Amino acid sequence: MLLLSGSVLLMASSLAWSAEFSASFKGTDIQEFINTVSKNLNKTVIIDPSVSGTITVRSYDMMNEEQYYQFFLSVLDVYGFTVIPMDNNVLKIIRSKDAKSTSMPLATDRQPGIGDEVVTRVVPVNNVAARDFGRSSRELNDNAWRGTCGDYEPANVVVMTGRAGVIHAVMTIVERVDQTGDRNVTTIPLSYASSTEVVKMVNELNKMDEKSALPGMLTANVVADERTNSAAGFGEPNSRQRVIDMVKQLDRQQAVQGNTKVIYLKYAKAADLVEVLTGVGDSIQTDQQNALPALRKDISIKAHEQTNSLIVNAAPDIMRDLEQVIAQLDIRRPQVLVEAIIAEVQDADGMNLGVQWANKNAGVTQFTNTGLPITTMMAGADQFRRDGTLGTAATTALGGFNGIAAGFYQGNWGMLMTALSSNSKNDILATPSIVTLDNMEATFNVGQEVPVLAGSQTTSGDNVFQTVERKTVGIKLKVKPQINEGDSVLLEIEQEVSSVADAASSSSTNLGATFNTRTVNNAVLVSSGDTVVVGGLLDKSTNESANKVPLLGDIPVLGYLFRSNSTETKKRNLMLFIRPSIIRDRSQFQSASASKYHSFSAEENKQRNVSNGEGGLLDNDLLRLPEGGNAYTFRQVQSSIVAFYPAGGK
C-alpha cells in the first residue's frame, strides 16, 4: 500500500513547545498505519496476526497528542479492531470480538479511561437491587459496542466491560436512578375501628389497584399496630396520602345496633361450650387491653338447653372469631365400640381327714379345724340319752359340717372320725361391650348386690342386732377412649370382675362371705379393630396342714389315728382382652349394631334349639313395633322374640 501522507508538524508557541499532528491516509495497509501512529506517539505496539486490511482516512485539522491518540482508537474501532493498553507504555491491538476474552485495565474515578479505550468498571449500587440494572445496562453496552455487563448480588454491584465513553454514559444513568426513595412514615391513630380490620380492608383495595401495574416505588403500604390501635402508612407521597384518606374514612363511629346472635348447635352441647367460648372471648379482650375504650366491649354468652343453642352478645369482630370457633367445635364426633372379653377358669381340690379321741376322766384329743369338735358331740350324746334331744350346740355343729362323720361313745370313751373331699370348678366367660363418644367416659355394670355382715351387737336382754351392708358383685367396665391420628385409640380402662367364693373357699369363722375380685386399671394404645391383652394371671397354689398329738401322731400308719390332715390345691387361669372399634358414620354404626344383633340371635337359637313352627308367642300377642321404614329389622326382632319364649307363650 501507498502511504500518501503521514506528516508530523512541530510548532512553537510563545509559552511552550507542543506536538501537533495531521493525518491523511488513502488505501494504506493498516499495519503501516499502526506503525506510523505508534512511532509518532512513541508507543510500543503488539499487533495480533489477524489484524489486516487497508484504511482510508483524512484529517483536515491539526491534533494534539491526546486527540491524535483518540483518532487512532476511533479509526481502529471503525475497522473492527481494539487497542488494549498494557503496562510499560505498550499497546495491544486485537480484533474487537476477541476483546471480551482478554484482560483489560480496571477503570477508577481517578483513571476512568477516555473515549474508545476499552476498560472494566465496577459500579456500586446503594438504594436499589443491582440486578434491576442488569438488563438496561446490558442493552446500552451491547448497542454501543459488544461489551459485557453483569451484577454480583452479594455485594450489590454492577460489573461492566466496554468503551470508556459508553461505560461513563451508563454510569451516569445508574447514578440518577439509584436515588433514595421517599420512605417517610405517617401514623394514623384510630378512634372507633380496629386497626387490624382497617388495614386488612385497605390492603384488599390496594390489591385491586395492582391491575394498573404501577411500579413498586409508586405504591404505598400500610401496617397495623395493635398495641396503640393505629395504622402506619409509608411509600410514595401521593400514594401514601391516598392510603391515609382511606384509613380516615373507615375510622368512623357506627350507629348503635344489635350485636346479639342465637346460634343453634347441631352436635355439641350448648352448656359445655359456654365455658370454652367465654375463655376465648376473654383472651381476645386481653389482647385489646391497650386499645381505646371504644373498642372494649363486654361479651355475654349464655346457653339455652331446651333448644341446645347459644345466645352470644359481642362486638362484630369478636363475634366473627367466636362463630369460627363454634363452627370448628360443633362437629359430629366419632364413637368407639369397646368390647371386652373376660375368660377365667378356676379349679380347686381339697381333702380333710382327722380322728379325735375323748375320755371323760383322762382328757381329749380334739381338732377344731375339722368343723366338728368331739366334746360338742359327746355333750349332745349325753343330752340325747337324757331327754332325746341333741341340744343346741351339737345341732349347730352338725348343721355347719360338710362331709362324713363316724365314731362311737361307750362308757367314758369316745372316738370321732371326720372326712371331707371337695372339688370345685368355676368357669367365667364374659364379653361386655359398650359404645361411647370420643373423649367421653362410659360405665357398664352387670351384677347383683350381696348382703354382707358389717357388725353385730348384743343387748342386755341377750338380743343380737346385726348390721348388714350390700356389696355389688359382677362385671364393671369403665372406659374413656381418645381417638388419635391414624385410627389409633388411647383407652383409659377400669375393669373389675367380682364374685362370691364357694363355701369350701370361705372362712369357717362365720364372718361372712368371701369375694373373688379381679381389677385392671391401666391405659393402652390400640389400633381400631385390634384385640390386645390388658391383663392376665396364671396361678397355682397348694396348702397342706397337719394337726397331731405329739409322738403318737408320728407313728407310721397308726399315727393317722392321732392327727388331722388337710390338703388344698387351687389353679386359676385368667385373661382379660379388649378391642376398640371406631365408628365414624351412620353406616358403620348400623353395621356394628347388626353384627351384635345377629350374634345374639344365633346364640339364642342354638341354646334354645327351637324347631321351626314350635311354640313361641302368637303374632297377635307380640308388642307391635312401627314398621315405618325398616320392615326387615322388624321381622328379625319379631322372629327372635318368638324363638326366645317356650311353647305356649308362657
From Swiss-Prot:
Residues 587-650 are annotated as: S domain. Residues 1-18 form the signal peptide. Residues 258-330 are annotated as: N3. The keyword Repeat does not apply. The record marks G447 as: May serve as a pivot that allows opening of the central gate for substrate egress. It holds the Pfam family type_II_gspD_N0. One of its GO terms (cellular component) is cell outer membrane. Forms a cylindrical channel with 15 subunits. Involved in a type II secretion system (T2SS, formerly general secretion pathway, GSP) for the export of proteins. Required for the translocation of the multiple pectic enzymes. This subunit forms the outer membrane channel. This is Secretin OutD.
